[in-house]
A protein has these predicted regions:
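Disulfide-bonded cysteine motifs in exported proteins
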Residues: 46, 80, 118-121
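Bacterial N-terminal signal peptides
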Residues: 1-7
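N-terminal trafficking/processing presequences and adjacent post-cleavage segments
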Residues: 8-66
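Mature extracytoplasmic domains of secretory-pathway proteins
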Residues: 48-102
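Short, compact, well-ordered microdomains
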Residues: 94-119
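Generic marker of residues within folded, mature protein domains
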Residues: 3, 20-22, 79-81
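C-terminal partner/receptor-binding element of secreted or periplasmic proteins
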Residues: 16-27, 114-134
Length: 134
């Protein structure tokens, strides 16, 4: 099974259209490197020990990639809620390239592509006990 990462650059209301070129991620290749991690990059009152409960499974990451919409870097960095808790890992593209990904507890994520581009994602429809309430 493959998941699609969106590659277009046309923005409408802060999100990207799904109608353009796509790149497939091999679902079985999703590797979680860090789970329940804490980052000081986000200002907030979350403590590192609170992040230990944010544990994503491979299926959760796959569902995130499948359901998430692409957003602009501006929306990701300034407009969407953020959290200190995150998971990160790697995945293989159908063409053999490897991407790095990161998903936070506020349902924001990004994928660093082999060519250096970053795809920013947001998934308000993603549901699991580990994500913060919408």
């Amino acid at each position: 099974m493959t998941l699609l990462l969106l590659q277009n650059h046309g923005a409408v209301a802060g999100t990207m259209s799904r109608d353009n070129a796509e790149r497939a991620v091999v679902r079985e290749s999703i590797e979680i490197i860090r789970d329940g991690a804490w980052s000081a990059d986000i200002s907030g009152d979350e403590r590192a020990d609170a992040c230990s409960a944010f544990i994503l499974r491979q299926a959760d990451v796959g569902a995130f990639f499948k359901r998430a919409s692409r957003v602009t870097e501006r929306a990701y960095s300034h407009d969407l809620d953020a959290t200190n808790c995150y998971a990160e890992g790697r995945a293989r593209l159908a063409n053999g390239g490897v991407v790095k990904w990161k998903i936070d507890q506020a349902r924001r994520g990004f994928v660093s592509m082999p060519d250096g581009r970053t795809i920013y994602l947001y998934c308000p429809r993603c549901q699991t006990d580990w994500f913060a309430p919408n």
